[in-house]
Structures are given as structure tokens and as C-alpha cells.
């Protein structure tokens, strides 16, 4: 572990507290939605809600899609309610989004559930616990900017950039961040060049490895395209990097300890990400000091070239030669009990509840 690097982070952690509001805040933890990561978001939101409630704040866990239909919405922060009561565990398959949409037949007229904007405007800050397209594509952030709502995480521009894997790869290449060779392909197009097998086919806009399929031959390639196109009209096809998988949180522009993720079976897909016991996660990762510093520098550079703000998490692969590649940035990293960023923070001595508070502090620092 690089003591000087992490000492600087801990100083920033202490410094961020100086910007903390003296009064207890009204906080909306915004979760749910209708992306394939709905369940992940709700469990993240539940953890954040409990942590901030324990800090003494007035906190509401609010589903961005289902909202709050009761007439007493103006007084929700005064209500003594356990807002987590309806949140269950993450299942090992994608949530039934059609069933969720059926709960609100009018959803096409307005994505936001009843009184979501009204309640968020009452809050001092909205903690963005959303994952997937609905929360990470920048549209909600832009709407909040127009409505004077303060929120955690990065802004709408960098959110939109990072949601698109193809654009992110272009910026990585331009900014000197190593990334796997790949091409983009729209539905109905024929690629000009073929990425050699094995390759990975990814929905261009998606997360939690939903719509990500590996192909070893023509038959698997055709099936992978069919699967990925279920989630997006554009896909990214890139070289498969055989080796070790890592993730690096970047908070306030500084890289956190690296964590290595080793799935017990298969690769780091939706099930392995969120089911306890599906992966072996090692933090800090067992890497040389030189390799650690180089990967952290690449994570910080990726943060810059994608014009990110406040915090994010970068995913890497290292091949058998020891060369590493940045796969993508996660603008709203998972905050579930098995999530990576909280594990990285804990190595620095930052407990989960303090991390939640820190992410609020740095996001509100310019206020």
C-alpha cells in the first residue's frame, strides 16, 4: 500500500468535513427506476438510507419511478416511517421491468413518479442511488439542474458520456488511457472489420454486465449480438482480455486502493456481482507498487478525460503479460453490502456511513 498517496486521501477526507452542514440535513435517497439494475439500486438505496439515518439526518428512500402518491407528501421528512420495509434482496436474475411499469399505466407521460420532483425540491440534497440507464445517462441530473435540486455524483454531461461505452472508449484512446481494441455496431449494420475470437459483445449503454456476452465462434457471436441488441440499438464488440479483473474508485479526483475481483465460476456477470459468495474480492489487490501506482494513475486520468466530478469507479482488466486496460467508468458506483467502493474505502479506515457522508460533502462543496 502506498502510504503517502493514501495519507493525502485521508487528509482530504478530514478536510471535506469542514464543508459539512452544521444542521442535520433533509436527504432524499433516490433509487429504483425501470432499468435492469432496479433491484441493485434499491438495495444500494436501503444501505445508504440506514447509514444516513444513523448519522441523525432526516432521510427518505424514494423510488424515482413509483414516487409517493399520498396527499401528505409535503410532510414526508417529519414522518416516522421505515422507508426500507418494501425493499427485498437482489435476485440472481434481472428484475421484471414490465411488471414494475404495470404499476403505473401513465408512465410514458412522465418518467418521474408522483411528487418525486416536489419532494426532492424540499431536500437539502438528493443522494443518487440509481444505477443503469435511467440514473446514469444524465437525463435526471439535467432535470434536477433545471429544477434547482442538488444531488450527489457527477453532472449530466459526464454522465451521458460515460453511459455510452463507445464514446468512452474514444475518449480513453484520445486521453492516453489503455482500453481494449474494439468496434461499435448498430442494429442492422455489417461490421467493416471483425474483432478476433474470443471477443466480448456489450450493449452500448448498460451496466452490471447486463447485455454483456462472450463469443468464441460464429454461432456464439450471432447469439451474443442477439442478446446485446435486446438492451440497446448499438453494441460494442471488443477484444477479450484474459486475465485478472480490478476496480479502482476515484473520489474527488484521487484513486482509492485497488480491489481485485475473481469470480468463482464464469466471469463477473450480474449474478456474480450481487450474490454473496459468488466472487473472491481482495483489497488492496496483490500487485507490485509500480503496477499499483500505474493503474491508479490511469484511473485518475480516465476520471479527467471523461470530465467526471466528485466520484466514480473505473473497471480494469490485466492480461497475462501484465498489461492493463480500462473497460469503463461507473458514474454511480454500487453501494450494496457487497459493493466495491465501500470495500476500498474501508481499507483507508473510512467506514460505510462515513463514506456516504463524504460523498455528500464533496458533492455539496461548491454550494
Task: Please identify what each model-predicted range represents.
Residues 216-297, 318-325:
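Phosphate-binding site of ATP-dependent enzymes
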Residues 59, 150-151, 179, 199, ...:
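Hydrophobic beta-strand scaffold residues
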